């Protein structure tokens, strides 16, 4: 398969991969794709294939020189043609700071040793690529990601329910649909529907005077920065946002459709986030 064929297949598989990661994280359809990988610590499809191709390269160069597969490889290396597999290997190696001349060193390694080296280098490469992509998206460019070695703790901790982790993911990426400024082009107005005095942003929700009157001390005890803090801070701020969203639903519901007194927050186990 040549480069163009691989690119086409990668694009198809990547669409499926994105759908799976969006289902896991509860991500909004407009969430930048790189955030799916930066938050989960996963490699995208092109880099997964890069790792596997280099592992197969090690397998080939470790074979006896009289084996047919090794002979084909040597022929490609000596007289490469456009679209040959060897060209993709060269490109992969170049991206992680290696060359074909490192064959002898690679042959001396066990599969696990080489795999660990390749995965480490490819993860660093992917991290750089994702962070570069992230820098072009205003909503998420200031979120710091230093490694792809593991997912963000909130996605795997047993201290936090899946609904909470999905809420947190969308708050971190400014894709929680209830806040108008997250998607200004899709909303007729952008003012806070509760106080009608400030832009309807996630940050303002914690400072809204109506929210403060209704929820009181709970709101003042958390900071917006908690969304990007440790797990305990994230749990605290998510509880407040959960209550804010319930309050908004209660106060903004059409008259006669509320389940309790105006402004009351009705606990609902089926929709509880924490």
Language-model features, listed with the residues they occupy:
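Amphipathic alpha-helical surface "interface" segments used
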Residues: 38-45, 111, 115, 189
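Residue-level recognition of conserved structural "scaffold" positions that shape functional pockets
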Residues: 33, 48, 64, 90-92, ...
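Flexible, low-complexity interdomain linkers flanking nucleic-acid-processing modules
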Residues: 53-166, 238
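Family-specific functional microsites
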Residues: 135-274
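Non-catalytic, peripheral interaction segments enriched in hydrophobic/basic residues
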Residues: 1-77
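Short, surface-exposed acidic
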Residues: 28-35, 101-103, 222, 229-236
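Conserved aromatic-histidine-acidic binding/catalytic patches
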Residues: 4-8, 106, 156, 180
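Generic recognition of well-structured, leucine-rich alpha-helical segments
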Residues: 23, 27, 43, 52, ...
């Amino acid at each position: 398969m040549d480069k163009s064929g691989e690119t086409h297949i990668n694009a198809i598989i990547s669409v499926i991969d994105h759908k799976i990661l969006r289902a896991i994280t509860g991500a909004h359809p407009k969430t930048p794709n790189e955030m799916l990988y930066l938050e989960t610590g996963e490699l995208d499809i092109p880099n997964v294939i890069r790792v596997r191709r280099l592992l197969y390269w090690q397998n080939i160069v470790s074979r006896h020189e009289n084996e047919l597969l090794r002979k084909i490889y040597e022929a490609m290396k000596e007289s490469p043609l456009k679209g040959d597999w060897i060209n993709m290997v060269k490109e992969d190696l170049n991206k992680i700071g290696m060359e074909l001349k490192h064959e002898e060193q690679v042959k001396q390694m066990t599969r696990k040793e080489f795999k660990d080296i390749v995965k480490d280098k490819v993860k660093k490469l992917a991290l750089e690529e994702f962070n570069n992509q992230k820098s072009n998206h205003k909503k998420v460019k200031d979120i710091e990601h230093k490694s792809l070695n593991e997912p963000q703790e909130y996605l795997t901790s047993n201290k936090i329910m899946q609904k909470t982790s999905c809420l947190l993911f969308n708050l971190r990426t400014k894709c929680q649909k209830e806040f108008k400024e997250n998607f200004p082009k899709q909303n007729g107005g952008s003012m806070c529907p509760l106080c009608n005095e400030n832009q309807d942003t996630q940050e303002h929700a914690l400072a809204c005077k109506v929210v403060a009157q209704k929820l009181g001390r709970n709101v003042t005890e958390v900071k917006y920065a908690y969304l990007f803090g440790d797990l305990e801070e994230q749990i605290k701020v998510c509880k407040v946002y959960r209550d804010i969203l319930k309050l908004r639903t209660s106060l903004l519901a059409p008259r006669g459709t509320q389940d309790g007194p105006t402004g009351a927050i009705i606990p609902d186990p089926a929709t509880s986030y924490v």
